[in-house]
Amino acid sequence: MIVPKEKIEEAVKQALSKENNPKRGFTQSVELIIAFKDVDMKRGDIKLREAIVLPKPPSKPRNVLVVPSLEQMESAKRAEPNVILSKEELQKLQGAKRAVKKLASKNQWFLIAQDSMSLAGRILGPSLGPRGKFPTPLPSSSDVSEYILRYKRSTLVKTKDQPQTQTFVGTEDQPSGDLAENVFAVLNSIEGKIKGPAYIKAIYVKTSMGKPVQINLK
């Protein structure tokens, strides 16, 4: 365990306080920042690209774009993703750079039927890559509703060339205890992939426009 849950909740409460989080005219995201030490990112000491299901779903689900197969279409609709496209509709986006960029900006996850993955890579890839996003293949089963629902409550933890990662863990209107559970779930999921707590320099919680609050690791 990297840090006890009660210390996480203490930091979450501070991050949500008026002192650190002045009221805005919209519901802010709550983010977790993990800074690493004694690692060489260019050498690949830490490589993270993990989809982690949040145990306490955010009040607003993650936006998911889905391109199901014909057999998966009805079950995909039941999950009510943000955007659902047929393979033919995806094909029609070829060359529509503005529309593709808009889809890339507004959605967090891109779940694609396996027979449409190469097409999605060609059409969506150029807009997804610079945003740190990527197509994820749907399973081959005909019922993909539960799979899509899981991604509507999932967050992405990824690293690039900097020794840190920043990820969504909920929204400011959630109870602090729920947010703490989500932070705990993320830390628990990546603990085995970062060579242990000794490589963590600091962990912070913050709202999207608020001040970061450091979690006490001692």
From Swiss-Prot:
Biological processes, Gene Ontology terms: regulation of translation; translation
GO cellular component: large ribosomal subunit
Record SUPFAM superfamilies: Ribosomal protein L1
Molecular function GO labels: rRNA binding; structural constituent of ribosome; tRNA binding
Keywords associated with the record: Repressor, Ribonucleoprotein, Ribosomal protein, RNA-binding, rRNA-binding, Translation regulation, tRNA-binding
CDD domains in alphabetical order: Ribosomal_L1
Family: Belongs to the universal ribosomal protein uL1 family.
Subunit (UniProt): Part of the 50S ribosomal subunit.
Function summary: Binds directly to 23S rRNA. Probably involved in E site tRNA release.
Protein name, as recorded: Large ribosomal subunit protein uL1
The organism of origin for this protein: Metallosphaera sedula (strain ATCC 51363 / DSM 5348 / JCM 9185 / NBRC 15509 / TH2)
Organism ancestry: Archaea, Thermoproteota, Thermoprotei, Sulfolobales, Sulfolobaceae
